[in-house]
């Protein structure tokens, strides 16, 4: 068994794994142990009361966090004509059609999000084996296949996050950075939970949001008392 580092021992001693912390206290605990040489991300895990084996109970979507994620997002857009001009004006980093597809086929993938107008999906569809495994394939369910590409670019640039439950029915995503204020992190988390509640499948029974835990990149998870949200 691997030995615990000093930091891991300190975290283990300082975090009560049996306790659900009031949100401000939870954030304070995270910040206390966010001592890496880089600004750590603050991540959240939300356990949902769904049966992920049933396709009609899977949860997937996107929402814009009020305070963003703290990271710069590079956006590639597949579109043409007036939409291409609008995408560039909105801040897209890469805009094109077949020319952009050729870049991607060559392995040039310097972007974090791919957006496409519906008429461009004939081109994007050829890139499924490249974009799919990386979670980059545009999808209308998360707003990345849309006729309004300019709005989608603005959303991506302003802190939109995409979420999707894993095989255990858990949502994993980022709600900011460790240098965000307690208020910013709390409001970002609240925005995510509001979006998840709106996305609750009609077939899901019982308690929908069962557990919420937050953590930093190098830190331990801290359970959050939902009543404090």
Swiss-Prot record:
Any one cellular-component term (Gene Ontology): cytosolic large ribosomal subunit
Gene for this chain: rplA
Biological processes annotated in GO: regulation of translation; translation
Assigned protein family: Belongs to the universal ribosomal protein uL1 family.
Record function comment: Binds directly to 23S rRNA. The L1 stalk is quite mobile in the ribosome, and is involved in E site tRNA release. Protein L1 is also a translational repressor protein, it controls the translation of the L11 operon by binding to its mRNA.
Subunit structure: Part of the 50S ribosomal subunit.
Keyword Secreted: no
Domain of life: Bacteria
The keyword RNA-binding is annotated on this UniProt entry: yes
Pfam families documented for this protein: Ribosomal_L1
Protein name: Large ribosomal subunit protein uL1
PROSITE patterns for the chain: RIBOSOMAL_L1 (PS01199)
Alphabetized UniProt keyword annotations: Repressor, Ribonucleoprotein, Ribosomal protein, RNA-binding, rRNA-binding, Translation regulation, tRNA-binding
Organism lineage: Bacteria, Pseudomonadati, Pseudomonadota, Gammaproteobacteria, Pasteurellales
An example molecular function term from Gene Ontology annotations: tRNA binding
HAMAP family assigned: Ribosomal_uL1_B (MF_01318_B)
């Amino acid at each position: 068994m691997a030995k615990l580092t000093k930091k891991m021992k300190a975290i283990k001693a300082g975090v009560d794994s049996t306790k659900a912390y009031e949100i401000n206290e939870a954030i304070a605990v995270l910040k206390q142990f966010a001592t890496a040489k880089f600004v750590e991300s603050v991540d959240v895990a939300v356990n949902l009361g769904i049966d992920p084996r049933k396709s009609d109970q899977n949860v997937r979507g996107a929402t814009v966090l009020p305070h963003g994620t703290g990271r710069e997002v590079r956006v590639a857009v597949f579109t043409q004509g007036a939409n291409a001009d609008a995408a560039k004006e909105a801040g897209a980093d890469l805009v094109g059609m077949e020319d952009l597809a050729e870049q991607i086929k060559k392995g040039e993938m310097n972007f974090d999000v791919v957006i496409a107008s519906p008429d461009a999906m004939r081109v994007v569809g050829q890139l499924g084996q490249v974009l799919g495994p990386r979670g980059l394939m545009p999808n209308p369910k998360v707003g990345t296949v849309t006729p309004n590409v300019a709005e989608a670019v603005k959303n991506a640039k302003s802190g939109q996050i995409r979420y999707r439950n894993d095989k255990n029915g858990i949502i994993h995503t980022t709600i900011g950075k460790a240098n965000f204020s307690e208020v910013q992190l709390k409001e970002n988390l609240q925005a995510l939970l509001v979006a998840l509640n709106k996305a609750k499948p009609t077939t899901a029974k019982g308690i929908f949001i069962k557990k919420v835990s937050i953590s930093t990149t190098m830190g331990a998870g801290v359970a959050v008392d939902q009543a404090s949200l």
